[in-house]
Amino acid sequence: MSLVLENVTYRYSQGTAYEITALNHVNLSIGDGEFIGIIGHTGSGKSTLVQHLNGLLKATEGAIYFNGENIYQEKYDLRGLRTQVGMVFQYPEHQLFEATVLEDVCFGPKNQGLSKEEQQERAREALK
């Protein structure tokens, strides 16, 4: 599975007096099986970039391809994309709030709409 960003630009509040360019012609290629880390100062665009990787934000300009398909094409399966493109937060203790580790690990499968049984089965497998 590959993820390619081509000349991705993103502007907050485009067309207003408050317009801010957060990403400016970003090009990035993440190959099959690769893991990446993104570092930078506060306000440098890290979170904005990451939100583009699974289609949470739509680029103002440019394109994003997952396995060769443009994720911005009409009727693209964004839900399917989000089941395959994952993120790990820098400070997970600020992101997860469940009473047990198992319930925290169920977070991803739960958001995929899986049954409680399937969530727990996948979480237990991941924790082995």
Set out the residue ranges of the language-model regions:
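Helix-to-loop junction immediately C-terminal to a conserved catalytic motif
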Residues: N54
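A short, flexible loop at the N-terminus of ABC-type nucleotide-binding domains that lies
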Residues: M1-S2, R11-H25, E74-D77, K116
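Short coil-to-helix segment of the ABC ATPase nucleotide-binding domain corresponding to the Q-loop/switch region
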Residues: E98-C106
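Conserved ABC transporter NBD signature motif
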Residues: G62-Q73, L81
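Conserved ABC ATPase "signature" region
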Residues: E117-K128
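The feature captures the beta-strand-to-loop junction immediately N-terminal to the Walker
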Residues: I39-H41
